[in-house]
Amino acid sequence: MKESIKLKLDLLKDRYEEVGALLSDPDIISVQEKFKELSKEYAELEPVVQCYQEYQNALNAIEESKLLLNDSDADMREMAKEELAAAEESSEQLEKDLQILLLPRDPRDGSNVFLEIRAGTGGDEAAIFAGDLFRMYSRYAELKKWKVEIVSESPGEHGGYKEVISRVAGDNVFNLLKFESGAHRVQRVPETESQGRIHTSACTVAILPEVEEVGDVDINPADLRVDTYRASGAGGQHVNKTDSAIRITHLPSGIVVECQDERSQHKNRAKAMSLLKAKLLSSAQEKQAKEQAQTRKSLVGSGDRSERIRTYNYPQGRITDHRINLTLYKLEEVVQGDLDPVIQPLLQEYQAEMLASISE
């Protein structure tokens, strides 16, 4: 291990112990905001420090085994040889784990997100597929104990959605969903197809991190046009009786957001503003990324919603992620919400790219 990395790990270990002591200080406990801030830092440091401790234990085991290689007892020497091999293998893996843990963390990884799904080519079948995708992400969210709220929806004529926007809240949401942005393609025989022909349809998915601080995005109220209208869809007696739904247009960019989920106009406006901030921030970051000269394009992809990233082939029970040439024959499990076998390889590829760029 490089001396600079070891020095950094020693500093992180010292800070971990310092924060641990502060968290038991009654003066800190009484200040809720400070206690929350330190608790978050402690939780972020813990996996790094624990891994570093295991790495140090493995190094100690290597030294002890080497000493026993010269023992007069043949059985003891053989045992030391086996233990040395195991400790060396363990230390190599732990060093790799530490390198990944020390990679710069995207500050947005812990953010909640807005999940946008829009039906593309394919008419009714595309809208039905949009509904399938929304159900897939909702079930994945359920497995992760995340909360999903629909912000706005436009139902398809024969099921599914022409468009559905939802807010997904919980731990590590953006980190796990950030590579879902792009065009998702489905190949299957529609229920309405009498000849049994396979149709191809597509939907676009966009993952927008929620903006936590108002200061992150500067919006001039004069740049906004706010319209109210009557909500449509489920809602019992209140439907079409009050203008509770909100449509906000950001005039300089032309971005339009809507929210009709809540019965309160005030709540709908707050949700719509939150979505608008996320869209404006995402737009600015996309522009910045395009302007930056990149020596190579990321295999994981740019997050451009027009980029075809994945195909769901029902006749073959196959799902293929085109960015990393990943093919799995477990389509049914994935669309039922078991997304980790797709998401984890994408994260690993991203980490490998970052490690390669750091070592270049």
From Swiss-Prot:
GO cellular component: cytoplasm
PTM field: Methylated by PrmC. Methylation increases the termination efficiency of RF1.
Highest taxon listed in the record's lineage: Bacteria
Entries under Gene3D superfamilies matching the protein: 3.30.160.20, 3.30.70.1660, 6.10.140.1950
Keyword Cytoplasm applies: yes
Entry's localization field: Cytoplasm
Positions of modified residues (N5-methylglutamine): 237
Key words, A-Z: Cytoplasm, Methylation, Protein biosynthesis
Keyword DNA repair appears in the UniProt entry: no
Pfam families: PCRF, RF-1
An annotated Gene Ontology molecular function: translation release factor activity, codon specific
Region of interest (Disordered), residue spans: 286-307
Bilayer-spanning residue ranges: none
Coiled-coil intervals, chain numbering: none
Function description: Peptide chain release factor 1 directs the termination of translation in response to the peptide chain termination codons UAG and UAA.
Similarity comment: Belongs to the prokaryotic/mitochondrial release factor family.
This protein's name: Peptide chain release factor 1
Organism this protein belongs to: Hahella chejuensis (strain KCTC 2396)
Classification of source organism: Bacteria, Pseudomonadati, Pseudomonadota, Gammaproteobacteria, Oceanospirillales
Gene that produces this protein: prfA
